Amino acid sequence: MLKGLSFHVKKGEVFALLGGNGAGKTTALECVEGLRRYDSGAIAVNGRVGIQLQSSSLPAHIRPLEAVRLFAEWNRVKADTATLAALGINSFAKKQYLELSTGQKRRLHLALALLGDPELLFLDEPTAGLDVEGRVSLHSQIRRLKAEGKTILLASHDMAEVESLCDRLAILKDGSLVFCGTAAELTAKSGSRYTISIKTEQGDESFFADNIADAMLDLLEGYRQKGIAVLDIKTDRGTLEQHFMELTGREQQ
């Protein structure tokens, strides 16, 4: 359930809906896409839209170029051969859909979403399930589309992906918006907060602290009183992912 969610996406930017499982990012994206009804509020979408769903699928025996032709006919548009070439569709054009790798399926569905040269793209977990090579390839395509002036709204749970691709992000927790802005603004929101990583004979632990000197003294005294030996201690101002976990109350994996 979404609760008072409000944000806007600027023309030509890559904007991420970020959150853990169940945070509401896919629900929010489906509302924007018109795939889910909402009880109150209003959504304005300005421009032609292309959609890539996380759970997209096609008939098992259809071939990529046949799928492109059919979708183009249904939507009364022409397929752009340059786009198909840029996405590498021709390299697996002779395969049936059931024979395609996850990465090839993602590229095919992105090609289908781009039919008709939409001004806006909605991508739901575009790199979920891809290996490193597939992720790098799809990230490259998203950057190319941004350079061409596309406005892209994507849902993701991957902070590294968001940091690499997006101009701004909205963080959702339990259906509510807890942050909206740039990655730099998210870091600044945490102020001077430090991350203290402590390695003991019983395992590793991490803590957040505003006053690092006092916090370290308190932590070390606490371990001493418990009779736990501290083997190593490190401090830093925290990664973007750590700021995200702090904001959403998630535990580091």
Across the structure, where does each feature detected by a protein language model lie?
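Catalytic Walker B motif of ABC-type/P-loop ATPase nucleotide-binding domains
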Residues: 121-125
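A short, surface-exposed alpha-helical micro-motif characterized by mixed small hydrophobic
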Residues: 162-164
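Helix-to-loop junction immediately C-terminal to a conserved catalytic motif
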Residues: 33
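Conserved ABC ATPase "signature" region
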Residues: 50, 69, 78-93
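Short, charged/small-residue-rich alpha-helical element at the C-terminal edge
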Residues: 185-253
